[in-house]
């Protein structure tokens, strides 16, 4: 034991009260720092779960990706899981009780994608193909069309064309411009209602001027440039 250790030990024994206070203070400080770190970690986990529940379980989003580019993203070493969504068009909702929402935005997802979406299944199953449809509980409650799981319905499918300053734009979002756009009929399509889900406001918000309908989709059914 060198001279420094000897002097330190001598002073510790000579000032027992001060030594005890110092030890207690150190213990309390370490405990407080540990508690703060634990609280911060818990808060971050809670925040992450809240965001995932509201927006979906994902970290990065790529938009306007062609079908032939999806494998490149899926096979990247940084990709743990992925979802694929495709805008399928619009369907008019004749008889909807909500005067502001008279159409449904149809979006197709690959079967493995539905589990990543911010929604909770209430009844039924996920769609498996583009003739099966999943709707929100909000739609059931507000549109009041009395759609039931297992029911087959026929919808007028098409798109909304917005002309602004001589520029034509096909709407692919329910962003408040549907009422100003012109309906373009494409085909009459038959769907089977296979599920009802509680969707987060991020997926289907009450501020939107259209409901959301989710269909099944097979990636290999899309053309390379879709």
Say what each PLM segment does.
Residues 1-31, 44:
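N-terminal Sec/SRP start-transfer signal
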Residues 3-7, 38, 188:
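Charged, alpha-helix-enriched surfaces in structured cytosolic catalytic cores
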Residues 34, 38-42:
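Transmembrane alpha-helix boundary/anchor motif
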Residues 41, 45-226:
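Basic-flanked hydrophobic alpha-helices used for secretion and membrane insertion
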